[in-house]
């Protein structure tokens, strides 16, 4: 030990002699003397109260049983020492010392894991994530389009995962958010009004032209047809088709349209009729048209042809949402043509008529209302009814809710026997919400709330809504109730439903759980297969893809329109990017594809927009479909999908650091430690004078930065051949320096400046690569580590707990069992079901 360092044993001796209290021993000091000596003599020079190198201390760690969070620190120490990364070269352990160190520390970690499982279980009690809450309320109230997550407390994420129990927190102030979420959800389900009129409403273009002055040269009316030659807004639409329906629900949308061509001079007038009618020329190409409402909420797309045809889609509208059409292939209003002037004849999109029908109602009152009030009759309210007037109901299932203003009669739920009906309805609702049978005493507590409301002359439904609101805010609904040890059949049903549906078990799964049949391995696996084939499994697949890959960040950046004018607000392209990645993950799971497809594949899911973006010919229309990639394409796999390349960039420039960290964390599951506070940042150079590689070389001269960047930067360099939207490039762009060029996109021309050449070469783990192709070959050799990362993430989705040290042996056994088949994604999902981590709390 250095002379300047204080010996802990000496401090204790001096303190004792002087009559001062002896400092509490750190956890490692009470362990085996040889191990404690290795810590004191090798680690504390850099990691005590004086040095804290890397902002990391070992001298003051409490025992693991007193502070379970220290187990994560010791696990980190174990991994760094086991990999030979610590101690540093000057004080490296011999092989024998390293083996003794890791063997002893491993035993301590296993002992801690065993003690934790005996006392509280492998996973502590956790609450539903925001997505799980929303799905559960949707299923409880039979409202498939309900949005409720925005009302709930924000999830604390752990490496992108939102259901890690140890990271969750619930303050008293957050209860107000759940009260608001419950109120909004219940009101969306209540239907105290006559059945809405569902007659189709047809709109002629002349009636849709109320806002034509705002669009000016974007569209014109020719008799009863609407003709568009440019996107009406700054870019990809939207153009409103209808007034906003008040009622939430499914709506059937139909419109008759075709593509065409038209002389630009015809747009001199706002509309045309009678003898002054310009000719709409036949179209010579198909166009992609998409339906949506707001950014990130597209419903459907159509490949509209030159032949007049009717197009149809059924969509969920939240209420007070205006449906919009996006003419994704028409040029932007501000676009310049490569010729430098507007052409005489423009491509056009022609709408003959549009129609909306809905809400489409299977029954009235709807299922959600019946889940709350059964078949109790609805009556017109009057003062003679003996109860106070019913509260106004806010209509809608989205962010915008409008309070219903009765224009005539008020209605209320009539019960001849409120005591009996409330008990019956509450028990049914509580058993579904709590995911288990409920005790009579639990029902009685909630029923007391109803009876108190009735004593205050509330009408029956308002009194019941008080209890329903309490149920949706109770710990029994918000938290996962499990006892330490083997899970019961009912607990297994709840866990399996949250894993594969992110929601509640259905009636079949609940019955199998209550009967105990679900504890049989073959029954459990059969149910899992059934659930994966159910449409509700898309919730799991999309949620897993979003969290694993960070897809929710897709709209967090916008390309700078000066550097990347061709991408200006191209929301349909961005939406296509996200859908491509989700479809790819879905295909990997449905077809049990080997894990190597994450790195590279010979196919992609493309529509015309994405295919054009990727340089793949022969794809038409807005619908995604599986496309075989041409030989030599840099695409294939997840790594080079545009969504991934966008979320790992900002709007100005790409960052090898950000992309490198993304690859290490999301693909390999080996996230680097957080940067020290004094690490600084690198400002992008948009002048084109220096490359990001040159800036990083200067940054790495700082010794505290060099070690981490040695592992972070190479994957990021490999992806430098892709711009901020995932477009392939060989040169950087600049705002000032470089050469002026005209970038061609069909008939359009964009003025840009190209600067220095892109260098996507690098070296990782002693192996050199010259481009993305060679980097992929190196990364493919890490398929076991990639599969390990996927298993670890699936385990969190399934249980709510990060893998412990003791779980590692089981995970390695699962990897061994799946190695021969290339670690198929579906197989990995199912393999977790037979592990003690899934079958025990």
Model feature map: region roles:
Residues 1-6:
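N-terminal secretory signal peptides that target proteins for export/translocation
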Residues 9-23:
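Bacterial N-terminal signal peptides
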Residues 29-52, 69-76, 81-82, 93-841:
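Low-complexity, glycine/serine/threonine/alanine-rich intrinsically disordered linker
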Residues 53-55, 88:
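Short secondary-structure junction motifs
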Residues 59-62, 87:
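Residue-level detector of conserved, well-ordered beta-strand and adjacent loop positions
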Residues 64-67:
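Acidic-and-aromatic substrate-binding clefts and catalytic sites of carbohydrate-active enzymes
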